[in-house]
């Protein structure tokens, strides 16, 4: 458990952060200048709060009242930066072993072979960094940080310098880290796609403060947080399981608490647990079940709430069993449908609107 109570003034900018981050991946998300990198650098010991405290699993790293301020090398934290920062004169193996050599053998909790296998870098061990692609360099940097046996792994926009293809290469490895190695991760990003793929817990930062924090699914489905999560990111994040594939039609079926969704053919095996994003703008509402319609996902639902978003849009929350969907419709549509809480309706979701990138494995 990472516990933060941080205050610092930098010119006109005031940072005032209180946050507890447990197991899994906690994402710090916010606009540029909201204070995300300042927080992670204070945790790492690269900058100093004016006052407050930092502790990991009850071990105090910083406390302004008692005068505790451990240097970075004594904090047992791994840090992955935007740039790989590998040693150019060492091979990949040498860079990885450097992380291990920082600790006595008895304190090493991670195996070189296990890290190399997870990150898929067996064939790179004898190469120098200059001979690696951007994605390969970042995977090696992640491995070096892991082999320092950190109590928590800090990642400051580790994919920001990569092109889309290299990001797609590295993301699956990061997604497995917390689960395979039981290392909590504090992940800084301004990319909602990355956050939705990786985070268990979301902390929304705004103006130097944590404006809201909690389970990813809860925060992403809250219309009141739209100014922080982004208008075009609005929607539901739900858990599901791959229940079947149909190669003849090129589709997969995903079972969730509330029904089954048809999506484009997934490469994930039957039984795989996934996280699924459904944009609020991609859901339609019908009062009666439609007849002979091309939309494959027609889900019985109950209206939970209806609230104006602006002069053009209305936010509607639907319940399909215990699962909530956030839907955006026009004010004209609301005037014609006259939706009210408790009304029975049908949610319509085109299979084509659920992109492959919106379905992520959580196994």
Curated annotation (Swiss-Prot):
It is a peripheral membrane protein. GO terms for molecular function: ABC-type molybdate transporter activity; ATP binding; ATP hydrolysis activity. It comes from the Bacteria. Residues 1-232 form the ABC transporter domain. Transmembrane segments: none annotated. SUPFAM superfamilies: MOP-like, P-loop containing nucleoside triphosphate hydrolases. The complex is composed of two ATP-binding proteins (ModC), two transmembrane proteins (ModB) and a solute-binding protein (ModA). Part of the ABC transporter complex ModABC involved in molybdenum import. Responsible for energy coupling to the transport system. This is Molybdenum import ATP-binding protein ModC. It comes from Paramagnetospirillum magneticum (strain ATCC 700264 / AMB-1).
């Amino acid at each position: 458990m990472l516990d933060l109570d941080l205050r610092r003034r930098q010119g006109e900018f005031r940072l005032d952060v209180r946050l507890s981050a447990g197991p899994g991946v906690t994402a710090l998300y916010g606009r540029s200048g909201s204070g995300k990198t300042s927080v992670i650098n204070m945790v790492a010991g690269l900058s100093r709060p004016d006052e407050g405290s930092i502790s990991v699993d009850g071990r105090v790293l910083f406390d302004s009242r008692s005068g505790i301020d451990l240097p970075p090398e004594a904090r047992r934290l791994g840090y992955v930066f935007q740039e790989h920062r590998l040693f150019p004169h060492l091979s990949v193996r040498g860079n990885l072993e450097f992380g291990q050599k920082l600790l006595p053998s008895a304190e090493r909790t991670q195996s070189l072979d296990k890290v190399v296998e997870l990150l898929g870098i067996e064939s790179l061990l004898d190469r120098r960094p200059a001979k690696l692609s951007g994605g390969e360099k970042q995977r090696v940097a992640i491995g070096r940080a892991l082999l320092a046996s950190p109590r928590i792994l800090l990642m400051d926009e580790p994919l920001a310098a990569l092109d889309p293809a290299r990001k797609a290469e590295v993301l699956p490895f990061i997604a497995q880290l917390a689960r395979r190695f039981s290392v909590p991760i504090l992940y800084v990003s301004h990319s909602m796609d990355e956050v939705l793929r990786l985070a268990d817990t979301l902390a929304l930062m705004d103006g130097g403060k944590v404006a809201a924090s909690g389970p990813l699914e809860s925060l992403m489905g809250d219309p009141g947080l739209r100014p922080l999560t982004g208008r075009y990111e609005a929607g539901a994040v739900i858990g599901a399981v791959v229940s079947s594939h149909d190669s003849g039609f090129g589709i997969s079926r995903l079972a969730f608490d509330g029904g089954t969704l048809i999506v484009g053919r997934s490469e994930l095996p039957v039984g795989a647990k996934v996280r699924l994003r459904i944009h609020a703008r991609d859901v339609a509402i019908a009062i009666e079940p439609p007849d002979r319609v091309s939309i494959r996902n027609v889900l019985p639902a109950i209206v939970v709430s209806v609230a104006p978003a602006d002069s053009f849009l209305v936010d509607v929350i639907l319940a399909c069993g215990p699962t909530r969907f956030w839907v955006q419709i026009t004010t004209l549509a609301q005037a014609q449908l006259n939706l009210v809480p408790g009304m029975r309706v049908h949610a319509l979701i085109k299979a084509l609107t659920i992109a492959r990138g919106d379905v992520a494995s959580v196994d």
